[in-house]
Amino acid sequence: MQSIFGTDGIRGRFNEEITYSLAYKVGYALGSTLEKEKPILIGRDTRISGDILLQAITRGLNESGKKFINLGICPTPAIPYLIKQENLSSGIMISASHNPPEYNGIKIFDHSGQKITKHFENKIQKLIEELNQNISVPRKVIPLNKNKDLMDIYIKSLIQTMGGENLSGLKIILDTCHGSATTCAKKIFQYLGADVKVINNSKNGLKINMNCGSTNLEPLKKALIESPAHMGFSFDGDADRVIGIDSKGNVLDGDHILFLWGRELMEQKILTNNLLISTQMANLGFEKAWEKIGGILYRTDVGDKYVRDAIKEKRAVLGGEQSGHILSKINNFSGDGILTALQICKYCKKKNINLNDWLKSSFEPFPQKLTNINLDFNINKLNPKTKILIDQTIENFQAIYSDNCRVYIRPSGTEPVMRVLVEAKNHDKVNSLSSEITKKLFSEINKIIN
């Protein structure tokens, strides 16, 4: 059996890769592994399939003898925060993050609120393989009570990160993308005194991430034109990432957030070794600008768990991804889109600067193009020999083009696509090289497969 775990837990299309039977087995395997006294915390995003998977996981936990607490619809970062705060045994988030509504996934956190290790994934996988019978969906759905008190604890913790700073005088637009941020983002910003407008704010799981959210900024840009505001923030489906937009429509992505936040910490002399952790997707313009002011950028493979591992190894205090996952010491290095947005607002207020001017003081990104090559298969589930051939082909492409620009190619850990990133000093070069590389790479991969 191929590993069910990808770069960010288990993920796939509901009723294909992610089924009721698999979710039950995950619950049973996890419940059988953990100590019985402390309960496990479970949350989900707004996807329609989330309730079915929740039923399956809790059934598995029950039959393994493990107690659980149902948080209901919540941001992913609420799970790791509350695990540590309430001394729980583990946590599960049912979400496919930024993926479309037909996808879902299962993220598992350990007793310290960190995503489980590869070793623990293998342990769960082995137990699941031993449960070889297919588990059918029961006719009767059992209602599950939600714990609202724990959600209030999480919300209060976010407010406390402001250190008494309020957001009065700031007009802010939030795109909650019909996802987890609908539960609390508006409430938090309003409590802090901001004038808040929210778009895509229904808990409609059929619309989650559809033409909205952190992977599609057009609705937020349009809203900022129609209702001028100081800034806007766009979250993904489970609210663990965020992208900002200033009053003039300029994008504040994860690279900009890391640069600006990192510079503040550097000036306060609390940024260890002036080090930031990011990934291979980080813009070259960001890296050069950061080095120019005396900083060091350490790159990891793509995925917030790799960023977190490097933060721990290098004893860094801040890291993240261009996509808007920002991991800071404030929240035990768990990506939290709402917390990140609050910190941006806090710095703007404390410095008495608008986001547009603050963004201008960061860096000019190199032209960058990310292209997805759609495949008929998940490259991570191929046999080892075929995967090695494809990996060698990728390395060859990166070596050939390294003199002209920066090329980074990787298979997605969650979807059947190959991602090709090309950076150069001008747009024409980026576009021509991207087109050339994707065509050749697609051809080479097909030769290997066929």
UniProtKB/Swiss-Prot annotation:
It is an enzyme of class 5 (isomerase). Its cofactor is Mg(2+). Mg(2+) binds at residues 97, 236, 238, 240. PROSITE patterns: PGM_PMM. InterPro entries: A-D-PHexomutase_a/b/a-I, A-D-PHexomutase_a/b/a-I/II/III, A-D-PHexomutase_a/b/a-II, A-D-PHexomutase_a/b/a-III, A-D-PHexomutase_C, A-D-PHexomutase_C_sf, A-D-PHexomutase_CS, Alpha-D-phosphohexomutase_SF. The modification Phosphoserine is found at residue 97. It comes from the Bacteria. Its EC number is 5.4.2.10. GO terms for molecular function: magnesium ion binding; phosphoglucosamine mutase activity; phosphomannomutase activity. One of its GO terms (biological process) is UDP-N-acetylglucosamine biosynthetic process. It holds the Pfam family PGM_PMM_IV. It catalyses: alpha-D-glucosamine 1-phosphate = D-glucosamine 6-phosphate. Activated by phosphorylation. The active site is at residue 97. Belongs to the phosphohexose mutase family. HAMAP family: GlmM_B. NCBIfam families: glmM (TIGR01455). Catalyzes the conversion of glucosamine-6-phosphate to glucosamine-1-phosphate. This is Phosphoglucosamine mutase. It comes from Prochlorococcus marinus (strain MIT 9215).
